[in-house]
Amino acid sequence: MKQTFRFIKPIERITHLKPNATMMLFLASVLAVIMANSSLSTIYHEILEYPINLTIGGHEVFSHHGETMTLLQFVNDVLMVIFFLAVGLEIKQEILVGELSSFKKAMLPIVGAIGGMIVPVLFFLLVVHEGPGARGAAIPMSTDIAFALAALAVLGSRVPASLKVFLTALAVADDIGGIIVIALFYSSHINIGMLAIAFGILFIMYLMGRMHVSNLGLYFVCTFFVWLFFLQSGIHTTIAGVLAAFMIPARPGLHAKNLRAEMRSLFEAMPNDKIRQSGSSLILSHNQINVINSMRKIARKAISPMQLMEEYLSPIVGYFVLPLFAFANAGITLGGVTADALWGVPMAVFLGLFVGKPLGIYFFTYGFVKMRLCPWPEGMSRLNLMAVSLFGGIGFTVSLFIATLSYAGAEHLLFLNEAKLGIFVASIFAALVGIVTLRYELNLESAKAQKS
């Protein structure tokens, strides 16, 4: 009985977590599955087919191959650009000052990410190596960092910080690989003229950064036009979000070291005017308001446009874009999957994510360390490396996205449905086995510490 309670403790920890973006993403996915497999399925598909219109000067902005975008296309081709803009900002931060900022720091996560991209593809192709189903070989390449870190958080503060750092850096390197795959293999009929205009706008954004332009509105407007011309160029629009992110300056208008002195001088300049007060109501003088507004502007200058944009985008992506993406794309029709079909695309995706991804990350990382090409990360053992590698098999968001690109069109709907099933099952297995493995390792370490 005691063992049973010990086993369900992580589940209890999940149920006591306050609602967050990851939980909303999970709930949106569950809602999509319920609606797609109930009497609400007609309503669900009608929602996804709802047309999205925006006409400016006679030009229909949200147009997909000359036709008005449906809600599903709008989510995948427009809203996901915002997600990849946020991903690009995160990648840029890691390259500038994070775990990818030096060759020595970046080497091991990059090697692990490479293994975690190559081996899953091989496992997929072992099962489905020809025909239209093989188009989805890239599906098990990706890690969902939000769900992976949420699974890690289930075990609380006992998890070594080095594991979180390694998993985050691994996922960022993984994102870079996924972006390259999307750019190379999911673009068609490239319009060089439109692409040249898009890169011209990106160059203007670069010059704006060099000229210390910090107005986020201008960068958002430029990003919109970069997206618009990428949409017409034939290269997938998510690449526009990533490239635009790299153009956002990371240099603030005021160095943090000078912020305290600036604030002190403004604080000392605060007029000692009489404050009118009645109960909890309080009215400042105009001079006091001016000084406080100056403080606000100075404080804002101390934050770079890159970090400001990330702060703005984070809640939008977490609480709106990703849950809506999950709702639009996670609707698996379980009734349409036969027993024979399970051995095709679903098994290929499952083996790629749950077996290939962890093995690729683990053996590439461990092999690199054994060859003395890179030091073993502090606080990491072989067993918790395997646990982190299993968390890498939680694909979900980006895997679903690549599945929609791989099996686009009505003729591939069955493959898309099967791929979604494989992603769901593999991600759940990877999370559960990863949690159990890491919990076992942490308990072993705790027992050893108590004996000593």
Curated annotation (Swiss-Prot):
Alphabetized InterPro entries for the sequence = Na/H_antiporter_dom_sf, NhaA
The subcellular localization recorded is:
Cell inner membrane
GO CC terms: plasma membrane
Which UniProt keyword terms apply here?
Answer: Antiport, Cell inner membrane, Cell membrane, Ion transport, Membrane, Sodium, Sodium transport, Transmembrane, Transmembrane helix, Transport
Membrane topology per the entry is:
Multi-pass membrane protein
* Gene Ontology biological process terms in this record: regulation of pH
Q: What Pfam families does this protein's entry cite?
A: Na_H_antiport_1
Membrane-spanning segments: 23-43, 71-91, 108-128, 136-156, 165-185, 189-209, 216-236, 316-336, 349-369, 385-405, 418-438
Catalyses:
Na(+)(in) + 2 H(+)(out) = Na(+)(out) + 2 H(+)(in)
**What are the recorded GO MF terms, alphabetically?**
sodium:proton antiporter activity
Q: What does this protein do?
A: Na(+)/H(+) antiporter that extrudes sodium in exchange for external protons.
Q: Which family does it belong to?
A: Belongs to the NhaA Na(+)/H(+) (TC 2.A.33) antiporter family.
- Put simply, this protein is called Na(+)/H(+) antiporter NhaA
The protein's organism comes out as Porphyromonas gingivalis (strain ATCC BAA-308 / W83)
User: Gene symbol?
Assistant: nhaA
